[in-house]
Amino acid sequence: MAEPVLTIHGVTKHFGAVKALRDVDFTLERGEVHALCGENGAGKSTLMNIIAGVLQPTEGEIRVDGKAVRISSPAAAQYLGIGLVHQEIALCPDATVAENMFMAATNRRRAPLMNYRRLERDAQAVMNRLAAIDVRRRVADLPISSQQLVEIAKALTLDCRVLILDEPTAALTETEAQQLFSIIRDLKANGISIIYISHRMAEIFSLCDRVTVFRDGRYVCTDRLADLTPDDVVRRMVGREITQLYPDKLGADERSGGIILEVDGISDGARFHDVTFGLRKGEILGIGGLIGSGRTEIAEGICGLRPRTAGTVRLHGAAQPIRAYSDAVKAGIVYLSEDRKGSGIFLEMSIAQNISVLDLKALTNAVGLLNGRAEAALADDFARRLAVRMSGIEAPVKSLSGGNQQKVAIAKQLAVKPKVILMDEPTRGIDVGAKAEIHRVLRELASAGIGIIVISSEMPELLGLSDRLLVVREGRIAGELSADEMSEEAVIRLASGMGSARAADHAA
């Protein structure tokens, strides 16, 4: 019997007093797609960073083709044929797509001169397998979904024997995801071994052969997916039953709350046009649509992050002169970006500093000195409410898992006691247990009278969480769906231009 391509035995990793991994095992066979599952903070990303040479284990052994190895750096991992596609974007924004794709490959091959024409030709050939993206474009000019495809294409240039994909479809459209799945199946057929990290059970059961589950930094089990159901995997991940992923929606008698936010005919002259809708007090209003439809741009236009050429935003009936995000925060409107590391959090700063950063004025005394005790109390309160897994509020945010970083980003917005919260992909890349916690928090905030707008590309989240749903198509409101009218088919028809609903003028 052939040796596994990768064997992990007894690996432990400490970050100070925090034990991120405790004596874990993992085996990857040749030509298999192996799912790695667990809640955020379970240790998945830590192990993948060890395999990819980003981190060094405190204890344990790694074998490649049966031989013990020390993977001391990402370059050493690449030499062994191991590639990692991070969940978070790690590209050079001012370089072109082609330059980003071949940066690691050219470093590895050490060519004395760069043939840019050949580089662009080879890069375009790889990129065409995923999407029609011009590799001469600057990465900073691409949307997040296209940047994620560049990350994947970059890994495909390395001729990997082991490819690690960490939430690769989190920012992709359905069409883009299907193209990626086709490539994964081709790679598998050619003997490439793939570690697939995802919280999307449908993807795992469609693509993967086996699943390994981690919980609280420990190895739980490895099973053939053919022998399991999605509920089996979830139970192994969380160690408990998830009884209700989505809290109860508003009852019919609760849906008549007064309008708290009015968006009247706003346009930016390019990405969204004549957008009109209302948000009721205590309501969770979902906004759906295809990636690139203008959902994010509408939210940015409301809160001063994107200039508007027309229209008015009113809060409690009063027009708000919002020209910058600071104006929106002062008025009581906050926005959680879909790009949490680019716009949502400060990785090098502490958890306490991140949570308090939007309202430092309230935490300073008459002479402008920060009240550290008040800051700590504020941060500790919100970190506990959102169940942030941490060693302490003074820990840097970069030490947290992706899901816990997202919780800190949400806590930062909540700390200013907003009247309206706009959340763009609030649970992207977060495990099922953390999703349930965040959904519970959102419903509690709505019950306290806050108006909440949720933009999501996850259909179950839109349908399960929203009291009312707007669908955006080509920068315009294509229609509105009440709780009773919501269905996946109805959303898809509106998003693709195949159906109609009540006019946007009646969206409130």
Curated annotation (Swiss-Prot):
- Cite the ABC transporter domain residue spans from the record: 6-241, 254-499
Give the main localization category: membrane
Locate the residues binding ATP.
Answer: 38-45
Query: Which Gene3D superfamilies does the record match to this protein?
Result: P-loop containing nucleotide triphosphate hydrolases
Q: Tell me the membrane topology, using the record's own terms.
A: Peripheral membrane protein
Recorded GO terms, molecular function?
ABC-type D-ribose transporter activity; ATP binding; ATP hydrolysis activity
Q: What is its EC number?
A: 7.5.2.7
Keyword tags: ATP-binding, Cell inner membrane, Cell membrane, Membrane, Nucleotide-binding, Plasmid, Repeat, Sugar transport, Translocase, Transport
Q: Where in the cell is it found?
A: Cell inner membrane
- Gene Ontology cellular component annotations, sorted alphabetically: plasma membrane
**Reaction(s) the record says it catalyses:** D-ribose(out) + ATP + H2O = D-ribose(in) + ADP + phosphate + H(+)
Does ATP-binding count among this protein's keywords? yes
Q: Which family does it belong to?
A: Belongs to the ABC transporter superfamily. Ribose importer (TC 3.A.1.2.1) family.
Please explain the role this protein plays, according to its UniProt record: Part of the ABC transporter complex RbsABC involved in ribose import. Responsible for energy coupling to the transport system.
Q: How does it assemble?
A: The complex is composed of an ATP-binding protein (RbsA), two transmembrane proteins (RbsC) and a solute-binding protein (RbsB).
Tell me the PANTHER family matching this sequence.
CARBOHYDRATE TRANSPORT ATP-BINDING PROTEIN MG119-RELATED (PTHR43790), GALACTOFURANOSE TRANSPORTER ATP-BINDING PROTEIN YTFR (PTHR43790:SF9)
The name this protein goes by in its record: Ribose import ATP-binding protein RbsA 2
Q: Which organism is it from?
A: Rhizobium etli (strain ATCC 51251 / DSM 11541 / JCM 21823 / NBRC 15573 / CFN 42)
What taxonomic ancestry is recorded? Answer: Bacteria, Pseudomonadati, Pseudomonadota, Alphaproteobacteria, Hyphomicrobiales
